[in-house]
């Protein structure tokens, strides 16, 4: 479900959310997180939360290391394993360059482009995930 920015602010206040995990994925599919306080939400929605991309393999070097995380409002989720008091919520993020253009290594943007390109050719995708382990 897509929430508005004001609905997310209201939800954060009503549910006693103390931290928001800004979640993204590196080029090998590993989940990465940055935590922000609720008072940083306005900045996250408008300009994004800056991070040093040179710290993530494949994301850039020191010369092009400024990237920004901008939350996708349709992905708000309260993390259930956290306490009822001082809760933590998660938002998946788009990765943007400082000029607002999408970062070419953003796996979610790459997937969306593939889906859009396929739809333009009359093809649709169905995705699923599977938990797997070996003993």
Model-found features: residue ranges?
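ATP/Mg2+-dependent ligation/transfer catalytic cores
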Residues: 1-135
């Amino acid at each position: 479900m897509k929430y508005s920015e004001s609905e997310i602010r209201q939800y954060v206040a009503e549910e006693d959310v103390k931290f928001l995990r800004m979640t993204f994925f590196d080029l090998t599919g590993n989940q990465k997180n940055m935590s922000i306080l609720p008072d940083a939400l306005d900045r996250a929605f408008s300009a994004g939360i800056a991070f040093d991309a040179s710290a993530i393999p494949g994301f850039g070097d020191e010369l092009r290391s400024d990237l920004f995380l901008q939350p996708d409002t349709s992905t708000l989720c309260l993390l259930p394993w956290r306490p009822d008091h001082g809760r933590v919520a998660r938002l998946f993020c788009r990765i943007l360059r400082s000029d607002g253009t999408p970062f070419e290594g953003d796996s979610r943007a790459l997937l969306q482009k593939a889906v859009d390109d396929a739809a333009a050719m009359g093809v649709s995708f169905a995705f699923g995930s599977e938990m797997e382990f070996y003993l």
